[in-house]
Amino acid sequence: SLTVAWVYLSDDPAENIELVPEPQIVATQEESGSTVVMDLPEQQEEQEVPINAPAEIDEPPVQSTPQISSTSIPETQVNQSDLSLAETQTPLSQVPNDNLVMQGDNGLLPVMGPDGLIAWKEYARPFQETDTAPRISILITDVGLNTKSSTAAIDTLPGQIDLGFSAYGRNLQNWMDKSRAKGHEAFLMIPTEPINYPDNDPGPHTLIAEATERDNLLRLNWLLSQVTGYVGVVNHMGSKFTASEEALTPVLTDLQSRGLMLIDSRSTRFSMAARTARRLNMPRAINDRYIDNVITSEEIQRQLAELENTATTFGAALGLARATPLTINEIARWSMSLSE
């Protein structure tokens, strides 16, 4: 059987291993708990690439429309009563924990608390470490940008599905509070420079590879201040920024000092994000597959099946998808099948 859940990190970062399946380049996209992340074998140092990401990626702008096939099946709404949501949407603790925030220039900033209190553990969804089933983690990105899609993601999906919040959304704390009330862990999307910036612009306060350390940290502080209650961050776009260890190091050092974890969306095979996080002993996870490059029921289900295969083979797998109505419905249907 398979379980939708985050696999928790060991308390000792040296024991953490980053899960990297054998790369199979078949599709394209530049985007977007506590998870077991496994140290890369030395011979795989140049193989950090999502299964369905190409060697080079044309990045859509932040408001681009995902590819929709002409054969797309009309979406149908999932009957929430069929999802046993009450069993999965156990409320998480209210945020913020006053010991984990400080007042910054633009709002509350995450900080480490006393006695080892850290955000990626405190805000995490509870986890049964004795469950040895293969684990699938899914992160739905772009939450907070669209009211209908954000509501559907929060209310329709099981609590084990994590949500990635855009720093550009309105009323983000309200969305965060609603999502935690339904059991969802949250990540904050951090816009990072793509190779063809500014033609493709992730948005204001994008982290830039050639900017000064001070400028990037000021931008990062603005982004982190837009909402509180997330366990970590995920890079949005970033094929240029994430390929620069020099640019990444001060940013990840700051994030690690705040008790946050990292998801490397791996929008490019040249991403150094997870590798740099490992060097800094930062909790981290690596995207294995983009689920909804092509938004059709058939293709989304095919990608989910491939994610299952990865989890069965390696013990855990992580996939990213966007908060579109069809994607949300298909992931909800798929999650039902795992419990059957």
Spans of features found by a protein language model:
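Catalytic domains of cell-wall/extracellular-matrix polysaccharide-remodeling enzymes
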Residues: 210-301, 312, 322-339
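Hydrophobic membrane-insertion alpha-helices, especially the h-region
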Residues: 1-5
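Juxtamembrane proline-rich low-complexity "stalk" or linker regions positioned immediately after a signal peptide
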Residues: 6-111
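Glycine-rich phosphate-binding "P-loop"
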Residues: 108-112, 133-140, 236, 291-295
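Conserved, mostly hydrophobic/aromatic
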Residues: 141, 233, 318
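Active-site beta->alpha N-cap acidic-glycine motif
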Residues: 115-201
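Extracytoplasmic/secreted cell-surface and envelope-processing proteins
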Residues: 18-20, 147-150, 172-174, 196-200, ...
